[in-house]
Amino acid sequence: GSANMVSFIAKQHGRNHTFYTQYAFRKEYASFDSYVKNHNFANLDYVYSTLSNHDGENPVDYAAFEANPTGFTVVACNAEDGSTKYFGKSDVGYDNFDILKASSAVPVACEPYAIDGVPYYDGGIADPIPVQKAIDDGYDRIVVILTRPKDTVREQKRDIGPARILRRTHPQAAEKLLNRYQTYNDEVALAKEYEQDGR
């Protein structure tokens, strides 16, 4: 999600499509070999530095991203204590997309990504649909894009196995993952309430 928004804000329409349809099949991008070598199925440095930096194959137009007044918030989960971390647009820099790496580090498939010495996992664990965060930040109209029908109730069973594995190294993040289903369902319910209110 966060990487898609960077391209959108930079007005590089079609950029993400290239990542999903061309680069994603490269073994440097994501592969079992990468997982065996460095415990990361997805090579976040390859995706968000090698390809995306100014001298990369498909660079982010950082000047356009920075000039666009559109707000930008990225969610990550602190791997050590399970807390939610919100990063802002000012946390992105020229050839510095570390917050995208942190927010894309899927537990078990990837090691947590450290920023300023703090390891982070994908924000979908801690705040999968940050509707309340958007309201708290003062937005009165919110668009929620779901990958499943809005009446689908998320179940815990898909997260039990990964949470058991994660508990060995990051028990607090594992607890967040184990309860993600409830957080997701609560936030969808909240979004529906706001929808009924015309927000």
Located regions from the model:
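Patatin-like phospholipase
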Residues: 1-54, 88-102, 143-146, 150-159
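C-terminal helical/tail subdomains of lipid-metabolizing enzymes
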Residues: 188-199
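Glycine-rich, charged/polar anion/phosphate-binding loops
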Residues: 58-59, 127-131, 188
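Active-site gating loop/helix substructures
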Residues: 66-167
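A short acidic, glycine-rich active-site loop
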Residues: 168-186
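A short alpha-helix-loop-beta-strand transition element characteristic
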Residues: 55-70
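A generic, well-ordered mixed alpha/beta core segment in the N-terminal half of proteins
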Residues: 53-56, 122
